[in-house]
């Protein structure tokens, strides 16, 4: 069968219709009762080296199984060794490992658990170093600096991507070519293709945890953020991808793009929540769902915009008074910004082991990134108040506005310049996630001529047709 015939044998997933949305929802309904594919994987046999295949199946099953919450340090070390052994065998065997996999669900579970254990180990090691209370564990960690090291984890993910040629395959699909022509002997096997694909999502997550938000987005250059992407077929992967992409945009001050990403996945979740409750990942998804509503509340406060009706209603229900306080700005809003950010941000990690001999010099990565974000918030604290005055005038004297705000004119001038610069944001249109066009993010613009402020306001008309269509669909 040719590549064109294989493509035409499947429904057109590029269609943005409600029919496609329902198909995606139905596909997720099938996932809910899926037991991670492990039972099928354990039953799979190879006609060749049966015992070796069964051993690999057992290792894959163990790799996808969550580690106990109260696991000892020795257990965490052993888990790292098991992952190293598994990935070394898959990547460095003579020729591709022959193993028929039941589906793509298990591959996400393996990569997801691998990164989760890396993240939790790094946070645990940092806590031990900062507290300085458990000398025995500190000594063990000091003697094993490379266990769950950042370089080792990144090396595994990049190696799986390179071995599977998955980026080349995705680029070929974008060009309308057959991906098998560039897949090679490894990438044509589902085992390598699935692990390589979800390693890209894993890299997005790891780079975001390390605080490199532009590199996090760069890793997704060959993945299209739409319903036909493979990650959209696995609910946990779908949710994770949009969360980390949206958060990366937010930390890069691209609030419009962040809102777009958060809104997309939150609308999808609202449509599938009735049958999520039976799934194994329901609690994790529900927690991430709440976190994204907190992040979208922050983004809307920093970048006022009109939201989807579903998102707007849920946001008002969850953060009614808090949202109003955020939008009003001022010093009293600072603690609320920090509280929401800490509750919704990823659990950041440090790329290097901590200093066990000097606990005081170790910084909590979450505190570090929170401080960076709060510096940005402080620059925009008075924007709502300034906007409320400027909307009343077409021209206004700088000293007059400074008198209203009870600040020094030069301090107000610096606020206005910062606000002017922040109002110019890059907005994604097409291409890679880092690409975009600079646009004026506010409906209010102004220019300074010495001490005279010239104000212009543009009001976008309401799209009443869309509003009527949405509400007619609800009635009928």
Curated annotation (Swiss-Prot):
Function of the molecule: Component of the eukaryotic translation initiation factor 3 (eIF-3) complex, which is involved in protein synthesis of a specialized repertoire of mRNAs and, together with other initiation factors, stimulates binding of mRNA and methionyl-tRNAi to the 40S ribosome. The eIF-3 complex specifically targets and initiates translation of a subset of mRNAs involved in cell proliferation.
Keyword Cell wall biogenesis/degradation tagged: no
A Gene Ontology BP annotation from the UniProt entry: formation of cytoplasmic translation initiation complex
Family: Belongs to the eIF-3 subunit L family.
Organism of provenance: Aspergillus clavatus (strain ATCC 1007 / CBS 513.65 / DSM 816 / NCTC 3887 / NRRL 1 / QM 1276 / 107)
Listed InterPro entries: eIF3l, PCI_dom
Main subcellular location of this protein, as a coarse class: cytoplasm
PROSITE patterns per the UniProt record, alphabetical: PCI
Keyword field contains Glycoprotein: no
Pfam families given in the database record: Paf67
Protein name, entry field: Eukaryotic translation initiation factor 3 subunit L
Quaternary organization: Component of the eukaryotic translation initiation factor 3 (eIF-3) complex.
Domain PCI: from-to ranges: 257-452
Keyword field: Cytoplasm, Initiation factor, Protein biosynthesis
Cellular location(s): Cytoplasm
One term under GO cellular component: eukaryotic 43S preinitiation complex
Molecular function terms from GO: translation initiation factor activity
